[in-house]
Amino acid sequence: MRRSRRAVLRSVLGIGLAAIVFAEIVPRIASYGSVAKQLANVSWPWAVALAVAAALDVLTTALPWRALLPQLSWLGALGFTQASTALTIVLPGGAPLGMAISFGFLRRLRISAGEAGFAVALTGIWSQVMILLYPLVGALLVFGSGNLSTSTATIAGASAAAGAVIAVLAFAVLRSPGSARWVGDMAARVGAWFMRLIRRDPPAWSGEALVQVRAERLAHLRRRWPSLTASTLGNQLTAYLVFELSLRAVGISIEAVPPSESFLAWAIGRVISSLPLTPGGIGVVELGMIGTLVGFGAPHAHVVAAVLLYRALIIVPTLLVGFVALLGFRRLEPQDD
């Protein structure tokens, strides 16, 4: 009962925060009337380009999972990724919630617990490390223009540091059984401490368990990591393509916002979206992206229009495809090992 109340409270707080952003903060940056005018000026060639890019963003979500689990059909991989992402959009929890939901759907697709856990962990690590490193890449691209603010540089540095920590820990796990045991034991202690804070049972995890998983899956990872890396990059950068096209579609020229600045704004938005602040990061992601671009001197109404257009193209197709997929998953039962 307490858990359900806490979940409801988190949802209410997240929705309240998003409402404040859209009702109070965004209108102070640009009126919705002026934003609507910019959106109304999107020509049909730009609309077609945006539709194609949005479709690519949806379709490429299956690539990382197919790289690790080739026994998954394309339709199965696409369906479960969209279903799990749709749930994370409407429920607060960020990346950790998405990983837990993905595991459950893989079990319903008759993937063994070991394979499902391994795939969820690796896709989560690969995705999160890249997301955390993108702001650093963007900051380096912007640095040469002299438009990089101290606050933006700080965000990029902190994000890159977090990504480096995750990458080092992952490398340690792969390097030797002893390192894997140490990382597993440390993760178990941190997990137990966190679960005590929220009054839940500690995770059933240990260093020995990680050593066993490493021994079972290391050869598979050595074969698959190049395709996993390429497919993860391909999927994530299609979302950036949607954002870049959104900027140009509403009339923001490359001179006003060069790709280096748009990439940094997009990268900051991706980092924020992985945090369990609001369902799907709605409100806070938009605010982070708008604030970054406005800080670069871009026209306010155009920026707000582009960001809202981008977010709609990322969220709405996933919700539609995801909830259709959910109807199918309800008929499946998890596999018994």
PLM feature spans:
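Membrane-helix interface segments
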Residues: 43-45, 72-79, 112-113, 150-151, ...
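Hydrophobic/aromatic residues in alpha-helical transmembrane segments
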Residues: 21, 31, 60-68, 82, ...
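Transmembrane helical segments that form the transport core of multi-pass membrane transport proteins
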Residues: 214-271
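Membrane-interface helix starts
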Residues: 8-9, 41-51, 217-230
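Membrane-embedded helical hairpins/re-entrant loop segments and their flanking transmembrane helices
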Residues: 58-86, 247-265
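A short amphipathic helical element positioned immediately N-terminal to and/or at the very start
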Residues: 33-38, 106, 209-221
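Transmembrane helix-loop-helix hairpins in multi-pass inner-membrane proteins
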Residues: 1-37, 84-199, 278, 282-337
